[in-house]
From Swiss-Prot:
Key words of the record: Copper, Hydrolase, Metal-binding, Oxidoreductase, Transferase, Zinc
Subunit structure: Homodimer.
Lineage, opening ranks: Bacteria, Bacillati, Bacillota, Bacilli, Bacillales
Organism: Bacillus subtilis (strain 168)
Residues given in the record as Zn(2+) binding sites: 87, 132, 149
Protein role: Purine nucleoside enzyme that catalyzes the phosphorolysis of adenosine and inosine nucleosides, yielding D-ribose 1-phosphate and the respective free bases, adenine and hypoxanthine. Also catalyzes the phosphorolysis of S-methyl-5'-thioadenosine into adenine and S-methyl-5-thio-alpha-D-ribose 1-phosphate. Also has adenosine deaminase activity.
Catalysed reaction, written as an equation: adenosine + phosphate = alpha-D-ribose 1-phosphate + adenine; S-methyl-5'-thioadenosine + phosphate = 5-(methylsulfanyl)-alpha-D-ribose 1-phosphate + adenine; inosine + phosphate = alpha-D-ribose 1-phosphate + hypoxanthine; adenosine + H2O + H(+) = inosine + NH4(+)
Protein name: Purine nucleoside phosphorylase YlmD
Cofactor: Cu(2+); Zn(2+)
Family recorded in the similarity comment: Belongs to the purine nucleoside phosphorylase YfiH/LACC1 family.
InterPro entries: Cu_polyphenol_OxRdtase (IPR003730), Cu_polyphenol_OxRdtase_sf (IPR038371), Cytotoxic_necrot_fac-like_cat (IPR011324)
Length: 278
């Protein structure tokens, strides 16, 4: 088994957060991971495990790919929930009544939402990615799991902080009980931005210099993973509560789709998290 800390490549199609794959004190088993591009039925340029219904792939192929992942964990795709991601910072709590939204038809997805969480078992949360940063959250004390989509816009709008805020203010979480994993995404070495983006980064309440490196006039390498880590720490999480994947979607063409590398015409990986009765 190949290990890509904090993920393990458990099948050609799935990277799993093994440290969370345990029963919590409320007798719920956490299933959390990130898909690769391999093992599905989609044809080029979406070959082969495309999970995005919004990229002009054949819907039937995407649904088959999603069903393949759902079946892997002995779940029904109708128990999964997807969102219409808009690069913002809206976080929504998901319950049993939301199951199936966006799973087979894009128009039924949760509207304009980039972060979702639940405290209910057998509700599986899913978001789609092709370079942006997947943020995974877990509070074993309150039995909360969540996932967020953080491109540069969602990052500067601090969607990670918004998730922590909702958990602490609405769900009674203590920041010291919240664990976060920052998943595979484009690395700083592969992600060049301009002053427009950096102006927004510099406005954040964390040090932009720790996440960016100027390479030329008005050109910067921006490490979105590190920026999200700094935001989460500023939100009350200790560094040891945050794990960061070193995997870069742009520089791993055998594993991942990349919007930037593939010039926009590509598939989507899926982040997923949920709890089953142990």
């Amino acid at each position: 088994m190949n290990t890509y800390h904090p993920f393990s490549l458990t099948t050609p199609s799935t990277l799993m957060i093994q440290d969370w794959a345990q029963t919590n004190q409320n007798n719920k088993e956490v299933i959390a991971g990130f898909t690769t591009k391999n093992g599905g039925v989609s044809q080029k340029p979406f070959e082969s495990l495309n999970t995005g219904l919004h990229v002009h792939d054949k819907d039937a192929d995407v649904v088959k790919n999603r069903e393949y992942i759902a079946d892997m964990f002995n779940t029904d795709l109708q128990s999964w929930v997807f969102a219409d991601q808009t690069h913002d910072n809206r976080v929504q709590k998901v319950t049993q009544r939301d199951r199936g939204k966006g799973a087979r038809e894009y128009h039924t997805a949760l509207k304009a939402t980039d972060g979702i969480y639940t405290n209910e078992k057998n509700v599986f949360l899913a978001l789609c990615f092709a370079d942006c940063v997947p943020l995974f959250f877990y509070d074993p004390v309150k039995s909360l799991v969540g996932v967020a989509h953080a491109g540069w816009k969602g990052t500067v709008k601090q969607i990670g902080r918004e998730m922590v805020k909702q958990w602490t203010e609405k769900e009674g979480s203590n920041p010291s009980d919240i664990y976060a994993v920052i998943g595979p995404s484009i690395s700083g070495a592969c992600y060049t931005v301009d002053d427009r983006v950096m102006d927004a980064v510099r406005a954040l309440p964390v040090s932009a210099d720790l996440a960016a490196n100027q390479t030329a006039k008005a050109q910067y390498q921006l490490d979105l993973k590190e920026l999200n880590r700094l935001i989460l720490m500023d939100s009350g999480l200790a560094s040891e509560q945050i794990s960061v994947s070193g995997l870069c979607t742009e520089s791993e063409p055998s594993l991942f789709y990349s919007h930037r590398r593939d010039q926009g015409k590509t598939g989507r990986m899926m982040s997923f998290i949920g709890m089953k009765e142990a």
